[in-house]
A protein has these predicted regions:
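Helix-to-loop junction immediately C-terminal to a conserved catalytic motif
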Residues: 48
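Short helical segment in ABC ATPase nucleotide-binding domains corresponding to the A-loop/adjacent helical element
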Residues: 93-101, 111, 115
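Conserved ABC ATPase "signature" region
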Residues: 108-127
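Conserved catalytic motifs of ABC-family nucleotide-binding domains
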Residues: 153
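Catalytic Walker B motif of ABC-type/P-loop ATPase nucleotide-binding domains
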Residues: 157-160
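ABC ATPase "signature
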Residues: 217-218, 226, 298
Length: 312
């Protein structure tokens, strides 16, 4: 658990982060979102003391993060930046092994961990471990950057605009990889983004920052349905809000008995994807199938549209 208590960072008379308090639960994903200059990166960097607070405290599992030397704290907390930050003169395997080497793991354990992480990120160790960063694509470099941050088995992973430099297709894959890895290891993830769509997609909770303050800290559903003020409302946007809301839930519990023709919609599809398919194909109803292709019932376009309305 990460607890921020009255956290403040001033540069002269300017409060870049101003009296921020909230708690991030273990094994969760927290998105810190806001416009440029809102204080989001400074806030995150105070968790691992890359930036020291002026006032307030950061507690990690009840322990003040100032009780450990900064270098030791940072070895326990994974950190990923936008442009991967890989050492260009080291191979992929050597990059991933950086922190395990620093903390004294033996060679066999390091080699096993490097191979495990490369396989998890679908990078064949026999092919990629000996490559250098310049021999990788942008998406591969970013995956290696995340693997390096996870190498020493940290409980916490901090990520600063981790997907901002990736093209849309690679970005979607990288986001899916991150959620799969988080589910496997149970890592507590805190990431900074200026993209509300990304925050809604990845975050269990979202902290919205404006002018150094957290103006709302809530679940994606609450952020979408009950924005705290006009700033949050504008940040969400109105044009595709219903679709964003639908993206948070699956179609499984909306399936009705009945039959319909045409290509089926997967039971684990989001309501947003299901509605998009029905609109695009011009259908009012579609069959729903499980992963084995067995028909489970039907989903109606009218029901999905009704679910997109703002909750009362």
């Amino acid at each position: 658990m990460i607890e921020l208590r009255n956290l403040t960072k001033r540069y002269g008379d300017v409060a870049v982060v101003d009296d921020v308090s909230f708690t991030m639960q273990p094994r969760s994903v927290t998105a810190i979102v806001g416009t440029s200059g809102s204080g989001k990166t400074t806030l995150m960097r105070m968790i691992n003391r890359m930036t020291e607070p002026t006032d307030g405290a950061v507690l990690i599992d009840g322990e003040d993060n100032r009780s450990l030397p900064p270098h030791e704290l940072r070895r326990r907390i994974g950190y990923v930046i936008q442009n991967h930050g890989l050492f260009p003169h080291r191979t992929v395997g050597e990059n991933i092994a950086t922190v395990p080497n620093l903390i004294g793991w033996d060679k066999e354990r390091i080699a096993a961990r490097v191979s495990e992480l490369l396989e998890l990120f679908q990078l064949d160790p026999s092919d990629f471990a000996g490559r250098y960063p310049h021999e990788l694509s942008g998406g591969q470099q970013q995956r290696v950057g995340v693997a390096r941050a996870l190498a020493a088995e940290p409980n916490i992973l901090l990520m600063d605009e981790p997907f901002g430099a990736l093209d849309p297709i690679i970005r979607t894959k990288a986001q899916a990889d991150l959620l799969a890895i988080q589910k496997r290891f149970g890592t507590t993830i805190v990431f900074v983004t200026h993209d509300m769509e990304e925050a809604i997609h990845l975050g269990d909770r979202i902290a919205v920052m404006d002018g150094g303050k957290v103006v709302q800290y809530a679940s994606p559903k609450e952020i979408l349905s009950r924005p705290a003020n006009m700033f949050v409302d504008r940040l969400i946007g109105t044009g595709d809000r219903p679709f964003r809301y639908l993206s948070l839930s699956g179609v499984g519990d909306l399936v009705e008995q009945g039959e319909a023709s045409g290509a089926p919609i997967a039971r684990d599809a989001s309501r947003r994807d299901a509605l998009a398919e029905l609109l695009w194909s011009g259908r009012d109803v579609a069959p729903v199938a499980d992963s084995a292709g067995a028909r489970l019932g039907i989903i109606r376009r009218a029901r999905l549209i009704a679910e997109a309305a703002r909750p009362a």
